[in-house]
Swiss-Prot record:
Cited Pfam families: YscJ_FliF, YscJ_FliF_C
Molecular function as annotated in GO: cytoskeletal motor activity
Cellular-component GO terms for this entry: bacterial-type flagellum basal body, MS ring; plasma membrane
Keywords: Bacterial flagellum, Cell membrane, Membrane, Transmembrane, Transmembrane helix
Organism: Buchnera aphidicola subsp. Acyrthosiphon pisum (strain APS)
Gene: fliF
Membrane topology term: Multi-pass membrane protein
Record-given protein name: Flagellar M-ring protein
Residue ranges crossing the lipid bilayer per the database entry: 30-50, 449-469
């Protein structure tokens, strides 16, 4: 191989580069441009290094808060940056917390709403009407701030119509509230969050029922559905009904599968649930008919006595005494034929009123019906034919069907008064010849206990990783090992020219005078045999030294 030709070509390329560089430096125009660009770059780098690092002070501010904060920053002579009307406000990084504390002294940011700090600025001599208006504004602002703490809510406004006090209950009206929410981009509120907002507002304001709250988003969509249809059809009621039906269906399967076998029974249960909230107050009065246990509430006796004297023509009798409503006279009176036992009877009237008031049995009961009470159950069950001694499928006997139906009734708590119904059908399944695995639990036990089943994914992963390492990492390690062994070969004084001649490639440099082709071939040789090129360069360096 002719190495002198290679050296000459390399020297020619160096000369060409030197000539180009010298020509470029001689041209003053290019030199001025180069120096100007270098100066501009140096100044830009110095300014960039000396400029303070900015950090976000506040983000997602309303226009009112943004203007107030910018005015405060101008008064404090603090540099700031912001991109657009909705972008963050940037301040120097080392002053972020100091600026936040100084702005907090002025109640900034307010979140686009005024809270109870409005009451701190009331003037002396303000009227009661204005004071009430300020309180309503402050309450609306505080509730708006509270709602904005929810992650999906960007901004909120609340309008409350407070009820006026009245002496008459029939003239008193309930309060109402309207809420408009501006949601974060790509965010939505679920039903639970909407209900939470409604109950939060309802519990913060007196005489404000949940039904009088309306929530609307920024696109004008009504978020809370208060219609009767929505109350009857919601996710929680569907889930509760499905849970009840699944529970009764599992009861039927669990009690019948030991008798007919797994897979030989299909059951469906339909439940009618009463989701109406009802309260009932009942008062009962019954007479106290038990004479032994009668309790007297009051007893009143009134006696009225009237006495009329008889007409006596002769001497006036001298009354001796008056006892037991009888008048006794002297025995010397004439015409004593009508006298008996020494007294003269007179006319008398006695009126006696006896009033007894007894206690009545009085009972008051207040009953609150549970929501979700079962109104009616209906069960439909299909049982497969059973095998006889010959292996043929035959229908079940009448007695066995009755027993199965009785078990179904007991399993679901059948109530005739409630109107429950059970329908049992004994029929041959369409795929009765398909073998149904009876011992399914054995398969799960095998999966848990089998070593290969548990560690097969890990084994495959490690095997794949090993193949990748062997294919891509090992060749690099072999090249490094060869490079480490080159000094040993030099110590053994191996002639590099002989090593080059042993290689299988040959380059015809004499026939290729074109420099581009020569460089192209040298590049190909270096890509195919980097070891040979390394040895050539080392040989050149050793020769020059």
């Amino acid at each position: 191989m002719n190495f002198s030709t290679i050296e000459e070509s390399v020297l020619k390329e160096k000369k060409k580069f030197n000539n180009f560089l010298s020509g470029f430096l001689k041209n003053s125009r290019f030199l001025i441009i180069l120096l100007t660009a270098a100066a501009i770059t140096a100044v830009s780098i110095s300014v960039w290094i000396k400029s303070p690092e900015y950090q976000v002070l506040y983000n997602h501010l309303s226009n009112e808060d943004r203007g107030s904060i910018i005015n405060e920053l101008n008064e404090m002579k603090i540099p700031y940056q912001f991109t657009d009307s909705d972008g963050p406000i940037l301040v120097p990084k080392d002053k972020v917390y100091e600026i936040r504390l100084r702005l907090a002294e002025n109640n900034l940011p307010r979140g686009g709403s005024i809270g109870f700090e409005l009451l701190d600025k009331e003037k002396f001599g303000i009227s009661q009407y204005n004071e009430q208006i300020n309180y309503h504004r402050a309450l609306e602002g505080e509730l708006a701030r509270t709602i904005k703490k929810i992650n999906s809510v960007k901004n909120a406004r609340i309008h409350i119509a407070f009820s006026k006090s009245s002496l008459f209950l029939q003239d008193k009206k309930k309060s109402s509230a309207s809420i408009i929410l501006e949601l974060q981009p790509g965010r939505n509120l679920n039903t639970g969050q909407i209900n939470a907002i409604m109950h939060l507002i309802s519990s913060s304001i007196s005489d404000l029922p949940v039904e009088n709250i309306t929530i609307v988003d920024q696109s004008g969509k009504l978020l809370n559905q208060t219609s009767v249809e929505y109350d009857q059809v919601n996710d929680s009621q569907f889930k509760y009904t499905e849970e009840i039906e699944t529970r009764y269906r599992n009861r039927i399967k669990n009690i019948l599968e030991p008798l007919v076998g797994i897979g030989n029974i299909y059951a469906q249960v339909t439940a009618q649930i009463d989701f109406n909230a009802q309260e009932k107050t009942q008062e009962k009065y019954s007479p106290n008919s038990d004479h032994k246990n009668q309790s007297i509430r009051s007893h009143q006796i009134i006696i009225h006595n009237e006495i009329e004297k008889s007409n006596i023509q002769e001497e006036t009798p001298i009354p001796l005494s008056n006892s037991n409503n009888h008048v006794y006279f002297n025995n010397n009176i004439k015409n004593s034929k009508n006298l008996k036992n020494n007294y003269i009877p007179v006319d008398s009237k006695i009126n006696r009123d006896n009033t007894v008031n007894y206690e009545l049995n009085h009972s008051v009961s207040h009953t609150k019906m549970n929501i979700g009470e079962i109104k009616r159950l209906s069960a439909a069950v299909i049982v497969n034919f059973s095998k006889d001694k010959n292996g043929k499928f035959v229908p079940l006997s009448t007695q066995k069907i009755k027993n199965i139906e009785h078990l179904i009734r007991e399993a679901i708590g059948y109530s005739k008064a409630r109107g429950d119904s059970v329908h049992l059908v004994n029929a041959s399944f369409a795929k009765y010849d398909q073998k149904i695995p009876v011992h399914i639990n054995h398969i799960n036990t095998f999966r848990k206990s089998n070593f290969l089943y548990n560690f097969a994914p890990w084994f495959c992963s490690f095997a794949l990783l090993f193949l990748l390492l062997k294919k891509y990492i090992c060749p690099f390690s072999k090249n490094n090992t060869f490079q480490n062994t080159i000094p040993v070969q030099e110590k053994k004084s191996i002639d590099t020219r002989n090593i080059i001649e042993k290689n299988t490639f040959q380059v015809d440099l004499q026939n290729n005078t074109n420099t581009d082709k020569l460089i192209h071939k040298i590049c190909n040789i270096s890509n195919q045999n980097p070891r040979t090129i390394a040895l050539i360069i080392r040989q050149w360096m050793s020769d020059k030294i």
